[in-house]
UniProtKB/Swiss-Prot annotation:
Protein's UniProt keywords contain Translocase: no
GO molecular function, one term: ATP binding
GO cellular component terms listed in the entry, alphabetical order: cytoplasm
PROSITE patterns tied to this protein: AA_TRNA_LIGASE_II
UniProt-listed InterPro entries: aa-tRNA-synth_II, aa-tRNA-synth_II/BPL/LPL, Phe-tRNA_ligase_II_N, Phe_tRNA_ligase_alpha1_bac, Phenylalanyl-tRNA_Synthase, tRNA-bd_arm
Subcellular location field: Cytoplasm
GO terms for biological process, alphabetical: phenylalanyl-tRNA aminoacylation
Alphabetical UniProt keywords: Aminoacyl-tRNA synthetase, ATP-binding, Cytoplasm, Ligase, Magnesium, Metal-binding, Nucleotide-binding, Protein biosynthesis
Pfam families referenced in this protein's UniProt entry, alphabetically: Phe_tRNA-synt_N, tRNA-synt_2d
Record gene name: pheS
Catalysed conversion reaction: tRNA(Phe) + L-phenylalanine + ATP = L-phenylalanyl-tRNA(Phe) + AMP + diphosphate + H(+)
CDD domains to which the protein is assigned, alphabetical: PheRS_alpha_core
Record's protein name: Phenylalanine--tRNA ligase alpha subunit
Enzyme Commission number: 6.1.1.20
Length: 331
């Protein structure tokens, strides 16, 4: 057997010099593995004279324990050093100036839509949606626009080749809702509508909210009270309002609602903001509701119009030009 003392001394020096866990593992295998130096020494004990085996065995076992402890301590030391190095590399300098994060916000039209629908939701109206590609019956005929009715020309409709169309108002949602729900009912429809018109105050695509109430006792006075409450809640102030007689095929009588709007110079002018009226009996008949028993009122508004008034925007097209400098004012 080779000198166990010199083997241990050299092994301890090699362990102390190891600079990585991989090198340390190679040393462990070379010393204590199945074919390692210390293991080989133990296997050779049987070849020694009986009187030498005990002392040699104790020396080898002691060497094995010393090396096992040295390997463990060196491994822990290397792991601590690796952890310290990683923490140093990942350290955050809290004295550095912070970064300004990008800030997102809702589009002003979305904000206005949510404000309008929220107000009517608190008044007990259920929000309903419908398709933007409509058929003629839901968009016109069910709403008392018979074929060749001159009022159809007011809507500047986009037609598809198969006779379908891009809805010109959200009133078709009301038709579908009345077909699926029995009175009494309260609902609002909100979404995009399309008309072939484009200028400072009109867009080929715009947003509309329409409301409908049908029961046995609704009157024009109820309609006026509802709209007065809505205008007050939306603008958070009281307005003088007037209802002017107007024609809409689906209501009778019909009216347009003006509010006394204060100009920047302090003067006041009447500003149209809503259309409304009592639901025409023909519309109720078309959806299977008895007009002798039930009455109802309906109203509608352009969302962009209310957004322009709320945010002081003079050109409707600014909402759809995607100019971040403009939109971030509302974030």
């Amino acid at each position: 057997m080779s000198d166990i003392q010199s083997l241990t001394t050299q092994a301890l020096a090699d362990v102390a010099a190891a600079q990585s866990p991989d090198v340390l593992e190679q040393l462990r295998v070379a010393l204590l593995g199945k074919s390692g130096s210390i293991t080989s020494q133990l296997k050779q004990l049987g070849a020694l004279p009986a009187d030498e085996r005990k002392a040699a065995g104790e020396a080898i076992n002691q060497a094995r324990d010393v090396l096992t402890r040295a390997l463990g301590e060196r491994k822990a030391l290397l792991e601590d050093a690796a952890l310290d190095a990683r923490l140093a590399a990942e350290a955050i300098d809290i004295t550095l100036p912070g970064r300004n994060g990008d800030r997102a916000g809702l589009h002003p039209i979305t904000r206005t839509l949510e404000r309008i629908t929220g107000i009517f939701g608190r008044l007990g109206y259920e929000l309903s949606e419908g398709p933007e590609i409509e058929d003629d019956w839901h968009n016109f005929e069910a709403l008392n626009f018979p074929p060749h009715h001159p009022a159809r020309a007011m809507h500047d409709t986009f037609y598809f080749g198969d006779g379908r169309l891009l809805r010109t108002h959200t009133s078709g949602v009301q038709v579908r809702y009345m077909g699926d729900h029995a009175p009494p009912l309260r609902m609002i429809a909100a979404g995009k509508v399309y008309r072939s018109d484009s200028d400072q105050t009109h867009s080929p695509m715009f947003h509309q909210v329409e409301g409908l109430l049908v029961d046995e006792h609704s009157t024009f006075a109820d309609l006026k009270g509802t709209l007065a409450e809505f205008v007050r809640a939306f603008f958070e102030r009281d307005f003088e309002m007037r209802f002017r007689p107007s024609y809409f095929p689906f209501v009778e009588p019909g009216a347009e609602v003006d509010i006394a709007w204060q100009q920047p110079d302090g003067s006041t002018r009447w500003l149209e903001v809503l259309g409304c009226g009592m639901v025409h009996p023909n519309v109720l008949r078309n959806v299977g509701i008895d007009p002798e028993r039930y009455t109802g009122f309906a109203f509608g508004m352009g969302v962009e119009r209310f957004a322009m008034l709320r945010y002081g925007v003079n050109d409707l097209r600014a909402f759809f030009e995607n100019d971040v400098r403009f939109l971030k004012q509302f974030a």
